[in-house]
Amino acid sequence: MSTNRRRMRVASVVAGIGIVAVLAAGCARGGGSPDATDGGGAPASPGITDESITLGITTPLSGPTAGPGTCTVAGITAYFGARNAEGGVEFGDGQTRTVEIDALDDEYDPQKAKANYDQLKSSVFAMTAGLGTPTNRAWREAAIADEVPQVLIMTGDPIFSDTAESPWQLGFVPIYQNEGGAFGELLAGSAEDHKVAILSQNDDYGEGYVEGFKAAIEGADNIEVVKELTYEATDTSVDAQLTELAGSGADVFFNAMSITPLVISSLQKTQELGWLPSWFLPSNTSSPSAILEPGGAAAFPGVYTVAFAQSAAAPTFAESEDGAAFLEQMAEYANYPDVPAFPHCVWSYQIGATLEQVFGEMTEPTRENFMAALRDVSGYTAPLMLEGSAVDTTQDGQPAVSTVQVQKYNGKGYAPAESWDE
């Protein structure tokens, strides 16, 4: 997709990426229907009527992050496309509404993300599902000032889950510190000594992963960080950093990287250098088919990541009732016939399911009532979650999902890693 002004709308009939994509130029902006109330006279917020609710998304739909970005729209589009086809979603105020999605491409550019938010804020009820830390940060303060929900977004930046700092926000995926910490705990439990080299993105994303990892290995006599470097999110190559890290003698490479092409080229470059450590990769840049296979990850003794959701690429995924329904709905309502290579499709689908839970508790068609209902979800097992994971929005400082499982690449997909030495 080549434009950042692309809109995707979920209707009560077939809708999806590539099927319904309307250029969002000069669209009239309006609030909720004047006669949409809670029955007791409370005026509706923008983006909701007695018949429908509209959600906004700004996310990368083109550029190097388009793969996972497109998934952030596809999953929720599929989920609500199916619900709309069944007649809509029942809300706590007694109304049944269809759910529409307006999605704009920000190309992973913070300025474009802010412009997209400004374009959407008056016509959508809430913003959701968008990918990226710098892009979501670009309009966080504006959303607070405008009192527009920015919720269940795909960033592990803890600021979005701090109620005092971000009263109109809530992240969906585990914070970066939780992911880095989970791997650190696994490594610290090893019976062997390890030298670690770190490469991280020079922003809150990279810093969060490193912070969690270092906290987990603090006091572990068997772990030594021997070299630590950073890169910029705008860099097109990290060959220089990899060459320097390869000379460190590290047997473990902690790579907190968010850019898909850079991860692939890093896997390839380290092999060219003859440096074959075990790797850690974040959950959003560890896809077996889209990243590990083209990068030649099977050459390394181990590639580890973390997860809270089932992988659509797993051999047994389509055999389960939820997995089969997901794939069918992705094809029918999101124009996504292939098995998703990125986990963001499943995450976005789970966001849709979580929002349906929240809608069912809304007693007024207002953003304030929505936020109150959102912060009261506990113990909800969304479709396609791994055993032991659940949605809990009641913990201040934590996103909707805070538990992760460390996994190890087996050449085709991932299997749980109970210990480093197994």
Task: Label the predicted regions.
Residues 111, 124-227, 280-304:
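Extracytoplasmic ligand/sensor domains, especially the bilobed periplasmic-binding protein
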